């Protein structure tokens, strides 16, 4: 069975792992998911990530989720913005901070996948994949 929206599947797996309080979540690997994981790590939303592969199975991205001292997840909300049926685009001059800078948008651009902060620095727009805070 094919998956119609693998990015939404990734975000749902992260959301479900946060609800369960899991320290790690496994996600089927792809280039765009690796880029999203790297941005989440750089912005401080996850501890780390790595790609693991056995000879018998497909490669997986293992995300190590991050929690506060009181056990609350660092990712309070993670939301898919652009969907296969409704694409959402952002012009370079329309990139505004998410929740006054407390969150980020992850955007795919002609220069690669980057956070909204980096888009403002580079003055580039693109498709908004998701928002995290």
Residue ranges of model-derived segments:
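Core subunits and conserved enzymes of cellular information-processing
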Residues: 1-133
